[in-house]
Amino acid sequence: MASLRRPSTAIPRGPASVQFDRGARPPLPNDNKQKRMSKVGEKIKKRLSMRYGGNESFSVPPPLPGASDFLTADPYGGLDIETPGEDLAASPFGLYGASDLKESSIQSSQPLDTQEHLVDESIGRRGAADATLEEEWNLEELSNEKVDAQAYVKKVLTGADEEEKRRFVAALMREKQANKKELQRTVFKHYAEFVAISKEISTLENDMLELKELLGQWKDLPQLMGMEDTLAPTLDRNGNLERRRTQRKSVFDLQNLYRNQLTQLWSIVEGSQKYLPVVAGRHLVFELHGVVELNPATYKPKQNVSIFLLNDVLLIAGKRRNKGGSTTSVGDEKDRDRGRMVAERCWNLIELGIVDVKDGGELVNVIKVHRGKEHCVYRTQKSDDKRALINAFRQISREANEKKRKDSEKEQERRKTMWLGDKNGNGTGNSGHPLSTIGPSMADSKDLRWIDEYGDELTMAIAIRDWEESVKLVEKGQALSKSIESNSSAHSLLVSRLEQLVPSLVSQISHDLSSSNLRKSSSARLISLLVRLDLADHARDSFLESRRELMFKRVRSIKCDGDVSIYINELAVVIFTIIRHTSDWYMNAFKENNMASGFVTWAKQQIETFADLFRRQMDAPNISESTVNECLHVTATQNRKLLRDVGLDFTFLLSSLLQPSSNPSDYPHSVFTSV
């Protein structure tokens, strides 16, 4: 490997045959000798302690404006080679390397001290150049963002020669490479932190966008409410609180806004005006489009609907699509009409319930709306739509319950004060005594407020579905009404309250009695409550009607696989079993003998229903006589097992109704007589 040290121009290299005739060395002064030894030794030590870097390639920057192109030459080219001056041109050291130098022509013409002085200057220049590579210029000023590059270069290179300019450029290149490596190390060191911060920034950006949307909605709310943007009170010139005109018109503007909402809904949904008349305070709370209605039994899609949730009702609107295509002349108008929404259902929110169906399999984003025995299933496109609809319904329910509670409290306060006398009255009584005293000197001089308290107790008992307590209160009220017949005002007030509350109690008990999941003990208890209210006939009709509906429900669940005899057998089992159980339940609930005729009439109707279904199966053209006889035998067998053995013998009725001949007065069929 070649040495990194360059040949010095001060010490010539040539053949050993070249000899210099120095002559006798004159004595040197002592001070010059000491100066020379100290200076040369210092330079040599400094030179030996220098570190030399590797071969680094530096790109050549463009020349400075107004300056010579000093970057094209080697940055280190002038550190060791000096142009010989006039005083060195004649010396062997100055002419070393010249093309016209001959070995024979080199002669020593300079004294020894002059030659040693030239060597010291060359060594000093090399040492100064190497020592100032890192210390000559302060490049830390360039790290300041506000530094003026032109001013800095002008300050540093003022009066500099070509050598200093080259050294400055080399220092800049080294600083550039060092900064580049430091930047790479910093990037690699903080890469994981950079990725984490980027994720946090993206999350924060989404949160800011959501906050921006919410702030926009909040900003539009005062305008929709007919209010000013600011809710802070304003003061007039005198410092008094100023009333805004918008406060006076806020209620009126809000009603106009609600009316405009309903008008727009009428124009969008055909037939909605019939369900949604203008009512004070009625407004649209939430609407959802693109909802798919599912079959409650199979969960198969039926149609696309739109849901409109108002503060008191729920409107379901389907889309009406014309089967026929539109002509070109009136195409635009018919296309607009095609797909128009039509109101299908409208439910009161008080009677309504929404159930969140848990996601599973293909059943995703499904809600179930039930009203009594009616059930509807809907599927939304997104889970957010489903959640928003359920939250809106719950919020409206809470507001309705809160409003109902406040109205109840106001009603109670009104009832407490409605019977108090007016202080400014016309002298009908003292201010401290009620106006509705029952007689001036009755033993019981209580006012009529107890009637209101009685009505509140009965209302509360009905609300919490305590039927036993409700019936006791009704019986108490009926007894009190008979005892106060002499006082027309109290009697009329009590009777009016009973007439108002008893129908509600009876309807709710009847609804529970008509349930298909009712047990024997529960039905007997409910029937006894209605009997205590002198509604035995109503209880009988409600109970028997519910049993008839249950029978038809069980009949519809029978599968018909083509074998008529099996179908008739299952039909007879279902109908005869329900008749038998109904007889047992009926006799357990109604103890009076005069109520038995009602059950017999009902049982006769069910036997006739069975006979009608039986004849429909037998009247088919492909039914053979053997099949008919087999069906008759099955019917007679089930009649004996389920009815006749427990005392319900309807053989005569079945024999006459199932007689194959056209004359029902013929003798009973042999099957019924033989079984």
From Swiss-Prot:
One biological process term in Gene Ontology: protein localization
Main location class: cytoplasm
Gene3D superfamilies registered for this protein in UniProt: Exo84p, C-terminal helical domain, Exo84p, N-terminal helical domain, Pleckstrin-homology domain (PH domain)/Phosphotyrosine-binding domain (PTB)
Coiled-coil region list: 134-221
Compartments it resides in: Cytoplasmic vesicle, Secretory vesicle
GO cellular component, one term: exocyst
UniProt-annotated stretches for the region Disordered: 1-40, 399-439
Keyword Protein transport on entry: yes
Signal peptide: none
Keywords per UniProt: Coiled coil, Cytoplasmic vesicle, Exocytosis, Protein transport, Transport
Source domain of life: Eukaryota
Basic and acidic residues compositional bias, start-end: 399-416
Function: Involved in the secretory pathway as part of the exocyst complex which tethers secretory vesicles to the sites of exocytosis. Plays a role in both the assembly of the exocyst and the polarization of this complex to specific sites of the plasma membrane for exocytosis. Also involved in assembly of the spliceosome.
Subunit-structure text: Component of the exocyst complex.
Family: Belongs to the EXO84 family.
PANTHER family: EXOCYST COMPLEX COMPONENT 8 (PTHR21426:SF12)
Name of the protein described by the UniProt record: Exocyst complex component EXO84
Organism: Cryptococcus neoformans var. neoformans serotype D (strain JEC21 / ATCC MYA-565)
Protein encoded by which gene: EXO84
